[in-house]
Amino acid sequence: MTLAPSIDHMADLAEKAWAGLPEPFRAAAGPVVIRVLDFAEDELLAEMGIEDPFELTGLYHGVDLTQASVADPSPRPAEVFLYRRPILDEWVERGDVTLADLVEHVLIHEIGHHFGLSDDDIHDIEDGRR
């Protein structure tokens, strides 16, 4: 019997995805903390107007690089949250992608927000890669 991928397993996939990104990309991003949780907190979902916790697979939290200032540095590094259960749910529903590829996709999407890109910008970039 195979067990469902754990938070630690998904964190390992995310770290491998991060390490596999081109060095210039990682250097430009600067310090980014990757956190894996089962779900987003209820308060966050309420703030975002999301009723179904399975709708949020990832979240960028921090000051995007277009807003960052040397004169007023952020007291905390940027954080990317990956939500295990929604990612697993999407992975099972899709059935056409590996879990590692889906984790990488969500991670890159959220890092795109770190660079100040909108969802539309990120989708345009992804469409150009296909």
Residue map of PLM features:
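Active-site rim/adjacent substrate-binding subdomains
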Residues: 1-102, 114-121
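Acidic-residue sensor for enzyme active/binding pockets
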Residues: 79, 110, 126
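Catalytic glutamate of the conserved HExxH
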Residues: 106, 110-114
